[in-house]
Curated annotation (Swiss-Prot):
Alphabetized NCBIfam families for the sequence: asp_carb_tr, PRK00856.1
Molecular-function GO terms, alphabetical: amino acid binding; aspartate carbamoyltransferase activity
GO cellular component, as recorded: cytosol
Organism: Salinispora arenicola (strain CNS-205)
Keywords linked to the UniProt accession: Pyrimidine biosynthesis, Transferase
Protein name, entry field: Aspartate carbamoyltransferase catalytic subunit
Lineage: Bacteria, Bacillati, Actinomycetota, Actinomycetes, Micromonosporales
Amino acid sequence: MIRHLLSGADVDAGTANRILDTAAEMATVAGREVKKLPALRGRTVVNLFYEDSTRTRISFEAAAKRLSADVINFSAKGSSVTKGESLKDTALTLQAMGADAVVVRHPASGAPHRLAEWVDGSVVNAGDGTHEHPTQALLDAYTMRSRLGRLAGLSVAVVGDVLHSRVARSNVLLLSTLGAKVTLVGPPPLIPVDIVAALAPGTAVCYDLDAVLPQSDVVMMLRVQRERMNDSYFPSAREYARRYGLDGTRMRRLPEHAIVMHPGPMNRGMEITPEVADSPRSTIVEQVANGVSVRMAVLYLLLGGNNR
């Protein structure tokens, strides 16, 4: 098993499937009256979040606690970081405290890789800038496999703001490794073709959403990250929704078995309408639940829970 999880490129097909299989076992814990396992008792997991997050931080906290680990939540706001403490100084502090694993979210791309050089424990990337978010890709893959029974050969359309999406990058890497066929869809300014080619050469690019829907097993809608862009990327929110938003009419062009995903948070009415988000095809709530199971599996395997 790998020591850190920093990128979708860190896992080969065997490792990814081991994580997904372990997550399926962890999912059974959620149905128990007592939702706890003693696997990581005595271990310390630190959630080191330099960016605001609700879903991801709570998901990791729930995952660690269900494995009986001790959890320390660190928020940059109100901490020594606001007084100028560097990431390295924070890392050395965590090292001195004996952290067994550090889950880090940081606005700077590459920050988790630097952190991994400074601590002895395992580092899990919970999102770094516009770079990657590997556990989101794993939970997305788990959701696809749970709903559709396989990953190899699936046609997955990833739609929207690919340029600023760490989720898209990790999904391209992981899904390609697991044999899915990925097509990126969106306005030309939001599809970084050169970066995509470097990540996974077999990834397709299309600028017409309506053309890819009939052949898609999975449609993954991405949030338009307006906080990371100016108004030059597309004319208006209304025009974006008209060209690339998934509404009920477009959803009905999908194959009968196809599912709709979104990593959250959503801009309802922009990239996805409430009708679609709340439909039986939508896996959005499932993705949240599956995130806890997948992150339990990641922490369990990284910290040697299988050897305890």
